[in-house]
Amino acid sequence: MKKKQIEFENELRSMLATALEKDISQEERNALNIAEKALDNSEYLPKIILNLRKALTPLAINRTLNHDLSELYKFITSSKASNKNLGGGLIMSWGRLF
């Protein structure tokens, strides 16, 4: 695993642990627990981040996301958290046709 990815994963783990100690809604707690378990199972990091974003974005849009999760939400929506593959899957599947 790349050094930056390890650092990012460690920071995410730390933020998840801190957030789970806060007084947050059950919906938020469930999303964070799922992400934490996925990290423990060494699942694909971009997928974990995507699932966490899917769970928290509606809460952020509706302004019901707990204030204690704002730093975590900013962290997972930052550009360094996104997958930079930029269509690699399309190239892999359609590349043979050209």
Swiss-Prot record:
Matches recorded under Pfam families: EntA_Immun
Biological process according to GO: bacteriocin immunity
Residue stretches spanning the membrane: none
Keywords carried by this UniProt record: Bacteriocin immunity, Plasmid
InterPro entries: LciA_Immunity-like
Record's function text: Imparts immunity to lactococcin-A to naturally sensitive host strains.
Designated name of the protein: Lactococcin-A immunity protein
